[in-house]
Amino acid sequence: MCLLRLPVTLLVLCVALNELKATSIASDTGHQVGKRKCNTATCATQRLTNFLVRSSHNLGAALLPTDVGSNTYGKRNAPQISDRELLHYLPL
């Protein structure tokens, strides 16, 4: 019976410490929303574009920076409707 007390005590202590850590982190952050992380390739492309735009000012070409990332607007894929699907909806 004594052999079971130590693992049970350690398990209870471990659960209590994990609960304590979880409550302290949750109370520190409050209701803040974290910024979404972007794709590595997207971030690298944006940094390279911004660097090239800044360096081009020294050469005389003034290009506008290109916004690339998850928060930018761009062309969206529209659903394609074929002619056969349109004919199905027409009354005969």
Curated annotation (Swiss-Prot):
What is the first-listed, main subcellular location in coarse terms? secreted
S-S bonds: C38-C43
Compartmental location = Secreted
Q: Does the keyword Kinase apply?
A: no
Molecular-function GO term, any one: receptor ligand activity
Q: Which residues carry this modification: Tyrosine amide?
A: Y73
Keywords assigned: Amidation, Amyloid, Cleavage on pair of basic residues, Disulfide bond, Hormone, Secreted, Signal
Listed Pfam families: Calc_CGRP_IAPP (PF00214)
Q: Cite the propeptide residues by number.
A: 23-34, 77-92
Recorded hits in InterPro entries, A to Z, give: Calcitonin-like (IPR021117), Calcitonin/adrenomedullin (IPR021116), Calcitonin_CS (IPR018360), Calcitonin_peptide-like (IPR001693), IAPP (IPR000443)
One of the record's GO cellular component terms: extracellular space
Classify the source by domain of life: Eukaryota
Which example biological process does GO assign this protein? positive regulation of calcium-mediated signaling
Q: Tell me the first and last residues of the signal peptide.
A: 1-22
Ribonucleoprotein among keywords = no
Its biological purpose is as follows:
Amylin/IAPP is a glucoregulatory peptide hormone that plays an important role in the regulation of energy homeostasis. Selectively inhibits insulin-stimulated glucose utilization and glycogen deposition in muscle, while not affecting adipocyte glucose metabolism. IAPP function is mediated by the CALCR-RAMPs (AMYRs) receptor complexes. Amylin can also bind CALCR receptor in the absence of RAMPs, although it is more selective for AMYRs.
How does the annotation summarize its subunit structure? Can form homodimers. Interacts with IDE and INS. Interaction with INS inhibits homodimerization and fibril formation.
What family classification does the UniProt entry report for this protein? Answer: Belongs to the calcitonin family.
The free-text domain remark for this protein reads: The mature protein is largely unstructured in the absence of a cognate ligand.
What this protein is called in its record is Islet amyloid polypeptide
Q: Which organism is it from?
A: Cavia porcellus (Guinea pig)
Q: Which gene encodes it?
A: IAPP
